[in-house]
UniProtKB/Swiss-Prot annotation:
This is Holliday junction branch migration complex subunit RuvB. SMART domains: AAA (SM00382). Residues 1-181 are annotated as: Large ATPase domain (RuvB-L). One of its GO terms (cellular component) is cytoplasm. The gene is ruvB. It is an enzyme of class 3 (hydrolase). It comes from Zymomonas mobilis subsp. mobilis (strain ATCC 31821 / ZM4 / CP4). One of its GO terms (molecular function) is four-way junction DNA binding. Signal peptide: none annotated. Keywords: ATP-binding, Cytoplasm, DNA damage, DNA recombination, DNA repair, DNA-binding, Hydrolase, Nucleotide-binding.
Amino acid sequence: MTRNSLLNPEAENADPDQALRPRSLDEFIGQQAARENIRVFIEAAKKRQESLDHVLFFGPPGLGKTTLAQIIAREMGVGFRATSGPVIVKSGDLAALLTNLEDGDVLFIDEIHRLQPVVEEVLYPAMEDRALDLMIGEGPSARSVRIDLPHFTLVGATTRQGLLSTPLRDRFGIPVRLQFYSIEELRQVITRAARLLGMEIAPEGAEEIAKRSRGTPRIAGRLLRRVRDFADVAGSKIVDRFIADEALNRLEVDKLGLDLMDRRYLMMIADIYKGGPVGLDTLAAGLSEPRDTVEEVIEPYLIQLGLVARTARGRQLNGLAWRHLGLTDPREAEGKHSEIKNQPGLL
């Protein structure tokens, strides 16, 4: 079973949200602590007439890492170059990127945890010394050449900070964790997006979409566009709670923002493994999904909601998950039975 594409927090190849992206820190909604810290670092760098220190954004997908990287370049008044870890296969690929940067430019590397080790080795002196060490030739005649680079800011983004090597992670002077959004923050994101899309949305309609957006602005934007489709076909000039609820139910997105894959994940633990604990590899095999998909896409929001707990022995359902599924936790039933047995005269 494939995940509902509406609830996939990964970016689409042709990103329809591009026109909705905020273009400044003032327009950016949410991530208040991170946003205000970035504002301070930018102002300080501009006062000293220096390039901003290297920045690492980490956290679940869809929370604004790419957008913030673009905003940094815009606020600093410099150029912006973007690439991703899997694209940079050889050290020469990275060297070509670095040598084409202008002074002060921002180089954004998405999925930076997927850089090849040989590429990382080239990146270390570039980040620390603004220099590129290259080997020219082969064999006994090979020699090392150092090329000076312009001042630049590397902005890395990752959903798996733990997979970054320690030497690379330590070279980022500004590590920034991005958190899931609150319902109120998502309501503001949706209201702003609706205005830019030229559609009218009632506060309660925006809130209904926000509640089912998994704490992720990217998902909120997708759901908003699909709800707009239902509203247009129904002839409704305004998206209210009824229209939003009807559309999202038909899209099989429930009140907590869970889709069929999420519910299948929870039901597998509840039904087959009696609430757990159960190992990640076992779950991935049962769902016919890669381990990384389960760990990076399905689980973070379920854990954030308190539906699932990661324990040393595996994944385990919490009480909220049983209630959401409309089932009784067998461990609670066993506990009550034990209490009755221990009371004289009752059994």
